């Protein structure tokens, strides 16, 4: 681990249990669209493999993610393959 870059999947979905590498700004589970929580026991896991954002916090709401990135991660995923 270097600085705030965590090389492990650090967020776990509350609902479907999937663990994904994500950040507080876009931590929406693609599987079920629920907000995920960090699963790294307080390590600095703010780095996002998907969007590169590091906002220095571990949690977010879907509303925050939508405002920050202009839509949920799932929405952007399906737009990207359309």
Curated annotation (Swiss-Prot):
Its main location: secreted. Acts as a neurotoxin by inhibiting an ion channel. This is Turripeptide OL139. Keywords: Disulfide bond, Ion channel impairing toxin, Neurotoxin, Secreted, Toxin. Disulfide bonds: none annotated. It is found in: Secreted. The cysteine framework is C-C-C-C-C-C-C-C-C-C-C-C. Contains 6 disulfide bonds. One of its GO terms (molecular function) is toxin activity. Residues 58-82 are annotated as: Disordered. Coiled coil: none annotated. Expressed by the venom duct. The keyword Disulfide bond applies. One of its GO terms (cellular component) is extracellular region.
